[in-house]
């Protein structure tokens, strides 16, 4: 389903050169759910951006669904890649209505801006929003900017999966939310991933989320994958064991340390 072969990404040149991702190999089968942890600047978000096509790799190859997409633009790749980022506003069009945002999501990766908002389409959107169980079905004509952060992120989850993608990328998509909304979004995300059998990569600093979500877990540092947990090893992992893993590799995660203090 998704394969990265010796993928590297560098920024700048000469003395200012920064290697964000270094000779990374990764394979995910359909339905795999990979959680990614690591220190700040470890290359986690860069890895997701490379898969989304936002950056071209400096070297290496990216294969999606059997096709080499290394040189395919982010716009064309958007037909196959769903993406949810940290900022609830960034994943939506705040000045447009909920219905217009969903119509845009249906046109992801196509030439047309959005399909006509017919009564039939409104009815379909209402049913899909009602399934979220947070009251958005009554706010189809509401501007997204007027929604709460949790509501916007729930909408972003629906938009990213409205046309089921081959790969779903979650880049700290609960980090800007309060604990209650973060829990709601994680549960909602798992529900969509499970029901649609989506191949998923999730970046998070939340160790409990990393353990509870997904089938595999990797730890990154300085652009490299240092460790991987899967199967029973991941299912039985605990937060202290993940902290010990950071310590073993001399990795410092400031956000993790803050969580432990609080």
Mark where each language-model region is.
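ABC ATPase NBD coupling module
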Residues: 15, 68-82, 90, 112-118, ...
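The feature captures the beta-strand-to-loop junction immediately N-terminal to the Walker
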Residues: 37-39
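Helix-to-loop junction immediately C-terminal to a conserved catalytic motif
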Residues: 52
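Conserved ABC transporter NBD signature motif
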Residues: 60-67, 227-229
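ABC ATPase C-loop
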Residues: 160-161
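Catalytic Walker B motif of ABC-type/P-loop ATPase nucleotide-binding domains
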Residues: 168-172
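H-loop/switch region of ABC-family ATPase nucleotide-binding domains
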Residues: 204-205
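Conserved beta-strand-loop-alpha-helix hinge in the C-terminal portion
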Residues: 224-248
């Amino acid at each position: 389903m998704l394969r990265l072969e010796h993928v590297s990404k560098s920024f700048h040149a000469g003395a200012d050169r920064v290697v964000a991702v270094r000779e990374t190999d990764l394979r995910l089968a359909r339905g795999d759910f990979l959680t990614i942890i690591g220190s700040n600047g470890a290359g986690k978000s860069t890895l997701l951006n490379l898969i989304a096509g936002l950056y071209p790799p400096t070297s290496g190859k990216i294969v999606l669904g059997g096709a080499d997409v290394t040189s395919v633009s982010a716009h064309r790749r958007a037909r196959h890649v769903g993406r949810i980022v940290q900022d609830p506003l960034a994943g939506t069009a705040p000045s447009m209505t909920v219905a217009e945002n969903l119509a845009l999501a249906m046109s992801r990766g196509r030439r047309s801006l959005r399909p006509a908002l017919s009564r039939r389409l409104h009815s379909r959107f209402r049913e899909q929003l009602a399934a979220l169980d947070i009251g958005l079905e009554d706010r189809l004509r509401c501007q997204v900017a007027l929604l709460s952060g949790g509501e916007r992120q729930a909408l972003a989850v629906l938009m990213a999966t409205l046309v089921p993608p081959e790969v779903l990328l979650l880049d700290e998509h609960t980090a800007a939310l309060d604990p209650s909304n973060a829990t709601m979004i994680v549960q909602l995300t798992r529900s969509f991933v499970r029901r649609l059998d989506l191949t998923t990569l999730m970046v998070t600093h939340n160790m409990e989320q990393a353990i509870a979500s997904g089938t595999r877990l990797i730890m990154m540092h300085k652009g490299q994958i240092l460790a991987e947990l899967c199967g029973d090893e991941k299912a039985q992992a605990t937060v202290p064991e993940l902290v010990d893993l950071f310590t073993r590799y001399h990795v410092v995660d400031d956000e993790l340390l803050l969580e432990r203090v609080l």
